[in-house]
């Protein structure tokens, strides 16, 4: 057994509504707003696509998801040979880490970001440098100072999970200019569809100038397919060719591929979802207590408090399950009535 596994624990999902009801003695309805899921669900066309292909379940998937790859290639205007799929971004991160990292290599990322960058690096016996956040966001200058000849991967998350903060196009451009061209920079844009900031990076455009800038996206968030597990990376052809060696041959299911294609094609529904999210997100920042909230470009709000357990409990008491952190609570943007209840709690909470 790998000794480095002693440094890790298995992922612990949040308690189910049923478990929390029993633990806290809650009798009313509980809403799961802890995992940044799209509360509006996927496009209705997804259900139609799934139902129309149920008679294919006894077939293996087409390896590499060629239909979906071509659909994304057409929509984003990138060569299909530069796209690789995983069963969610979790698997994409695992494949890249496994393909690139050797014992003694180093990755650079941030504190308080998506945990799978750290987790998979430790599994591969790599060292992890976690640069503290600056004003709730990635400290890109601080990360540059950590680069040395052992650095093999740099992981960025934009907007960042769990804080919702982002760095701009110019900030990313200036960062990439200063990173040695042989070090891959992985830019995780899982929440990009929710972004409304005008200066958010056009990462696809930046890839034209920086061969080491690799982009990760997912169907789990805005597209509402978290239960079907489809994520992908857009990178250089050489990198994709190598990483594809690591990919399990049938990792994305046949049904997942059809569902993702249907979701991708319904851009009008996606626009409706993201507009609703933006409207509801803004409501949180219209109250005076928003001084305690980190500015978010995602479908969640991070609330800073030294009394995070008390805030978690207060939100639970109005029927909303959120995500507890030592320094705050992350609230997934819910339906209007759920958000209104949480905002009332936030208005009267002593931070």
From Swiss-Prot:
Pathway: Amino-acid biosynthesis; L-histidine biosynthesis; L-histidine from 5-phospho-alpha-D-ribose 1-diphosphate: step 7/9. Signal peptide: none annotated. It catalyses: L-histidinol phosphate + 2-oxoglutarate = 3-(imidazol-4-yl)-2-oxopropyl phosphate + L-glutamate. PROSITE patterns: AA_TRANSFER_CLASS_2 (PS00599). Keywords: Amino-acid biosynthesis, Aminotransferase, Histidine biosynthesis, Pyridoxal phosphate, Transferase. The modification N6-(pyridoxal phosphate)lysine is found at residue 221. GO terms for molecular function: histidinol-phosphate transaminase activity; pyridoxal phosphate binding. It comes from the Bacteria. GO terms for biological process: L-histidine biosynthetic process. Pfam families: Aminotran_1_2. InterPro entries: Aminotrans_II_pyridoxalP_BS, Aminotransferase_I/II_large, HisP_aminotrans, HistidinolP_aminotransfase, PyrdxlP-dep_Trfase, PyrdxlP-dep_Trfase_major, PyrdxlP-dep_Trfase_small. Its EC number is 2.6.1.9. Its cofactor is pyridoxal 5'-phosphate. It is an enzyme of class 2 (transferase). Homodimer. Belongs to the class-II pyridoxal-phosphate-dependent aminotransferase family. Histidinol-phosphate aminotransferase subfamily. This is Histidinol-phosphate aminotransferase.
